[in-house]
Amino acid sequence: MAFPMPPHQTAYDRAATIFSPEGDLYQVRYAFEAVKKGWTSLGIKTNEGVVIAAEKRFIGPLVDIDDIDKIYKIDDHIGVAFAGMGGDGRILIDYARVFTVRHRLLYGEPPPVELVAKVVADVKQAYTQHGGVRPFGVALIFAGVNPDGTTKVYRTDPGGQYFSFKAIAIGSGEQVANEMFEKHYRSDMSLEEATKLALKILYAIIRKTVEDKEKAIATLPDQVELAYITVKERMFTKMTKEQVKEIVDSMREELLQL
């Protein structure tokens, strides 16, 4: 005797290439859920440059958190952070790096930030319309300074879409982060102000799991990663833990008020 399959186990659910009657690709939707479970990453653009920040979590007493990377250099003028499945993110980041090298060799100049985001989004899109593959369960934030000096931040989604933002967050804390961006982001922010805003946001997210404010502040330098690219130098720079701690110490009273 044959039994009907539950609605959540229909063909639309199993195949990445079949639309449901509602117009959904369920596997793509599920890939978005993988992103929402990831550690939070942020991108902020200012007139002085861009800031990339990411959350790192203590996942076990034997794990060396200092060797966990959430922010990567794509080229001198572009950095990237991700949320979702780390292996998927690594593959796409390597693809973006190879693309930028080829672009420099062919055209003698670095590619615009949007072009790098687009080619990665194109790869993601291709994995939503071919059999035998699954969508990438990762979202990426590309932030950088274009050859003409303009600053850009892009988010690429599992379905192949990419969007430009002034400030954006992805991952498990994206709702908290984006609400804080809407309240506190200004287009005339300095790079220093953007860096402090990123730290405030990540502190607020960490406080969701750490009740004691003093402990959250003390562990903040261990649980965040920060990088920036200035319009003047156009050189990807990742901050050391000591540099992050210095900034955290300078804004201690502000953090205690959150």
UniProtKB/Swiss-Prot annotation:
Component of the proteasome core, a large protease complex with broad specificity involved in protein degradation. The formation of the proteasomal ATPase PAN-20S proteasome complex, via the docking of the C-termini of PAN into the intersubunit pockets in the alpha-rings, triggers opening of the gate for substrate entry. Interconversion between the open-gate and close-gate conformations leads to a dynamic regulation of the 20S proteasome proteolysis activity. Its main location: cytoplasm. GO terms for molecular function: threonine-type endopeptidase activity. Belongs to the peptidase T1A family. It comes from the Archaea. This is Proteasome subunit alpha. One of its GO terms (cellular component) is proteasome core complex, alpha-subunit complex. It holds the Pfam family Proteasome. It is found in: Cytoplasm. The 20S proteasome core is composed of 14 alpha and 14 beta subunits that assemble into four stacked heptameric rings, resulting in a barrel-shaped structure. The two inner rings, each composed of seven catalytic beta subunits, are sandwiched by two outer rings, each composed of seven alpha subunits. The catalytic chamber with the active sites is on the inside of the barrel. Has a gated structure, the ends of the cylinder being occluded by the N-termini of the alpha-subunits. Is capped at one or both ends by the proteasome regulatory ATPase, PAN. One of its GO terms (biological process) is proteasomal protein catabolic process. Keywords: Cytoplasm, Proteasome.
